[in-house]
Amino acid sequence: MSWSILELLRKNPEDLKNNLKRRAIDVSLVDKAVELDKKWRQVLQEVEKLRHQHNVLSSQISKLSGEERKKKIEESKNLLKILEEKEKELEEIENERDRLLSSLPNLVADDVPNGPDDSYNVPIKFWGKFKVYEGDVQEFLKQIKDAKVNYEVIKWKPKGHAEMLEDVLHLGNTLKAAEIAGSRFYYLFNDIVWLDFSLLLFAIDYITQQGYTLVLPPYMLRGEVIQSVIDLDTFKDAIYKIENEDLYLIATAEHPIAAMFFKEEIEKDKLPLKFAGISPAFRKEASAANKDLKGIFRVHQFHKVEQFIFSTPEDSWKYHSELITNAESIFQQLELPYRIVNIASGDLGACAAKKFDLEVWMPAQAKFREMVSCSNCTDWQAFRMKIRYVDRKNNRRGYVHTLNSTAIASTRTITAILENYQREDGVVEVPKVLRKYLEAFPKAPKDYIYPLKNKII
């Protein structure tokens, strides 16, 4: 099976144009690619004809002798030079065509909402009991629209996670971190650190019980690899590069896991391959210069557990559903109320054919905030990384499909816990599902996180 974008280019370039229009992409690139592909196929025919002629000559030479043999050998040498030049031309055209096609985003799935930005995202599910301050009820109802949800109106206004972390609990300090490292860094202390680790342990415990292989991946990738996994030209302001080194810090375990089979083939009967990666995540957040400046919701480093699947093309949508179901189960066990959102075409990243976000209700902010991103990247990454499956039984090869989803992003989930589990007196309840991961440690919180009387720093 050929790459889906190339296949659509050949079968129906107008459909490819229409697909790109859903992302507001310049469709003139399709016309350029069509011309390059026509040229490639034309030169390929010439190359195949020359190869045939050379094979015929080689066969004739083996049966000749004397001057006739010398004449044919010279003719063969000249033909070989022409063939080599044509093969070089073919390779150059193919590289130019594939470079152009590789600059295109993935094909958008049919059931993705059309729209240029996140205002066109469509909520498709709500879960849990939503805690809503009495002054925010109208705003809440506006956000849920006509959905039937279970919510509780409270008379006291919950404090934002940043205030809870630094001014109430005294278990974090972003100002001092900013002095020594810059904005969007933090110090976390004692019970919040235990909470961070318990979230990670819970996530890897749950996901591995679903049959996923636990992975601790490299925290850096070479330029060639990261360029294949993501659209680096678009995301260069989001990724940290090591100065004077061909190395980039990873933004998620998705990237090194996706590259695990870089330029390799996988036997079809071994698919699916399911992994749970745990790693730090490093992000510049340059495009979010004025967003979430306080607290630890949007930061340059955090811990993350990622789900990742290599799949056959025919099964990838089934596994996309599995990934978001796993993520939902995690947040249901944490008892954090959320909604699932089908992301609009103009808000999709280049890699994804379709993406679900899981957004938790934040009662202090009176809004839903993204905790999980779950994408089916179909063959977009696999083509760029040259990862194929081999079907020996039917003598076929094709590109695998890759899928990814957050299981837990620790700092974001902590912000959701601080806002949803706080009491009016400032005490924060530890989610019940996390408590067994804390029991073995004498200094870890067990049931509640209590405010300190004094700041640590």
From Swiss-Prot:
- Pathway participation: Aminoacyl-tRNA biosynthesis; selenocysteinyl-tRNA(Sec) biosynthesis; L-seryl-tRNA(Sec) from L-serine and tRNA(Sec): step 1/1
Binding site residues for L-serine: 252-254, 306, 406
Q: Where does the chain cross the membrane?
A: none
GO function terms (MF aspect): ATP binding; serine-tRNA ligase activity; tRNA binding
* E.C. numbers: 6.1.1.11
Which SUPFAM superfamilies is this protein grouped with?
Class II aaRS and biotin synthetases, tRNA-binding arm
The GO biological-process annotations, alphabetized, read as: selenocysteine biosynthetic process; seryl-tRNA aminoacylation
Q: Where in the cell is it found?
A: Cytoplasm
Instruction: Report the main location listed first in the record.
Output: cytoplasm
* Domain remark text: Consists of two distinct domains, a catalytic core and a N-terminal extension that is involved in tRNA binding.
* Quaternary structure, from the entry: Homodimer. The tRNA molecule binds across the dimer.
UniProt similarity note = Belongs to the class-II aminoacyl-tRNA synthetase family. Type-1 seryl-tRNA synthetase subfamily.
State the name under which the record lists this protein.
Serine--tRNA ligase
Question: What organism does the record attribute this protein to?
Answer: Saccharolobus solfataricus (strain ATCC 35092 / DSM 1617 / JCM 11322 / P2) (Sulfolobus solfataricus)
